[in-house]
Structure formats: C-alpha cells, structure tokens
C-alpha cells in the first residue's frame, strides 16, 4: 500500500512538473535537458566549433540541447557537420534514438572497439567538453551506493584526462553522500578550477548535484 502511495505521489509530481511540460513542448526527451541548459547559461560551456562528448547519453536530451546550441551558433563560413558548427559524440551502453547531427556509439567506452570508433570520429582532435549525466543503479545501502557513484565519476574523470584539451571542461552528475567530498578532491587533483552546481531543474528532494572541472592540471 505504501509503495502504491509513493508511485501515485511520484506520478502526480511528474505530470505537474513544469520542466516535464516544457520538455514535451520543446521536443526534449527528458527534463534533464534543462539542468544542462542552466549550467551552460551560467558557465558558458558550449560554444561554436567545439568537440563535445556526451557520456551515458541515453535517452539523449543532453545531446539534443548541445546540438541545438551548436546549431544556433553556426557561422556561415564554418566547416560544420550538417546543421551544426562543431562535433557531438554520444556514447551509451543502451540504445538511443538518433539525434540530428550527433554521432552515436553504442557500447562501453572502456572497451577498445568503442574507443576505436570514437577515435575515428575524433580524427585526431582533442575534446573541448565532456558531459556526463551517468548514474549507477542505487541500492539504498549508503556505503554500496557511495562506491558506485564514485566509480561512475572515476570513469568520467579518466575519460576526460585521456581526451580533453588542456583548457577543456568536464561536467558530471554526482550525489551528496558519504563519498561526495572524495569525488570533489579527485576533481581538484585533476582540474585547476572546480565548482559544484545545483540547477533549479534538479528536484528539491534529490541529492543530485553536478561537479564542473575546468583546465587540466596535467594534460596529456
């Protein structure tokens, strides 16, 4: 009975969520697009001509937002792919419906075959921005969940270290909990500038937050 009440409450909140309604109206696949939008408007992350990698991209709302932003910024004389000035590569182990002008690679980005596909698209270019809305399956057991969250952030940090330009940026989703301070310290070890972000589009009840790192300390 309690579970049914919880499901009904969640459904009520979801249906009446202004960001859900806005996403439906503006054609975004998930309300998460507005989290990236708020952070981008604050920090000016996405700019014409960039190479952007979206980790854990499905269902694709972050790639959609990035694509729309690069389409708005296209220059008449730009060398661009399709309707955007720049390159967006989305990776996920899950399938994802195509997004216009976005290269999608399905698979685990730790595997050689997936990295080979990525390198083919990059064609020797370094990445300007890595965005990650990845989240592990949470068990409700605090210690186990903290380890899973930290592992996902570690994967994004390692990917960024291997692919970012020296002045590049990494934005990852994280959760406040027992391991949060350790994750922040890892960011500070890797980036010159580190800042937490809690966009208004994140639900009030959620411990979700985002960490933004800029300018690698030891670029490869």
Curated annotation (Swiss-Prot):
**Region entry Disordered, spans:** 195-220
Where is this chain primarily localised?
A: cytoplasm
This protein's UniProt keywords: Cytoplasm, Methyltransferase, rRNA processing, S-adenosyl-L-methionine, Transferase
Q: What is the lineage of its organism?
A: Bacteria, Pseudomonadati, Pseudomonadota, Betaproteobacteria, Burkholderiales
The entry's active site is 173
Question: Is DNA repair among this UniProt entry's keywords?
Answer: no
UniProt binding sites for S-adenosyl-L-methionine: 60, 62, 92, 108, 133
Q: Does the keyword Nuclease apply?
A: no
- InterPro entries to which the protein is assigned, alphabetical: RNA_methyltr_RlmE, RNA_MeTrfase_FtsJ_dom, rRNA-MeTfrase_E, SAM-dependent_MTases_sf
Record localization: Cytoplasm
Membrane-spanning intervals of the chain:
none
Q: Which GO terms describe its molecular function?
A: rRNA (uridine-2'-O-)-methyltransferase activity
Name the job this protein performs: Specifically methylates the uridine in position 2552 of 23S rRNA at the 2'-O position of the ribose in the fully assembled 50S ribosomal subunit.
Membership in a protein family: Belongs to the class I-like SAM-binding methyltransferase superfamily. RNA methyltransferase RlmE family.
Protein name, entry field: Ribosomal RNA large subunit methyltransferase E
What GO cellular component is one of the record's annotations?
Answer: cytoplasm
Q: What is its EC number?
A: 2.1.1.166
According to UniProt, the reaction catalysed is:
uridine(2552) in 23S rRNA + S-adenosyl-L-methionine = 2'-O-methyluridine(2552) in 23S rRNA + S-adenosyl-L-homocysteine + H(+)
**HAMAP family, from UniProt?**
RNA_methyltr_E
């Amino acid at each position: 009975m309690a579970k049914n009440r919880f499901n009904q409450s969640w459904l009520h909140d979801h249906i009446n969520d202004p960001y859900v309604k806005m996403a439906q109206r503006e054609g975004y696949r998930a309300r998460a697009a507005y989290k990236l939008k708020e952070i981008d408007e604050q920090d000016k992350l996405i700019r014409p001509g960039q190479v952007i990698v979206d980790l854990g991209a499905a269902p694709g709302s972050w790639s959609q937002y990035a694509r729309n932003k690069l389409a708005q910024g296209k220059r008449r004389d730009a060398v661009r792919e399709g309707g955007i000035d720049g390159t967006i590569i989305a990776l996920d182990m899950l399938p994802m419906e195509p997004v216009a002008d976005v290269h999608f690679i399905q698979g685990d980005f730790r595997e050689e075959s997936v990295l080979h596909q990525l390198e083919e698209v990059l064609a020797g270019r370094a990445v300007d921005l890595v965005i990650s809305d990845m989240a592990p399956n949470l068990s409700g057991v605090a210690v186990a969940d903290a380890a899973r969250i930290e592992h996902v952030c570690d994967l994004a940090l390692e990917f960024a270290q291997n692919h970012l330009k020296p002045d590049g940026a990494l934005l990852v989703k994280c959760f406040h909990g027992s391991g949060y301070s350790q994750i922040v310290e890892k960011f500070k070890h890797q980036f010159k500038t580190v800042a937490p972000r809690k966009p208004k589009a994140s639900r009030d009840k959620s411990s979700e937050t985002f960490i933004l790192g800029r300018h690698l300390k030891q670029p490869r």
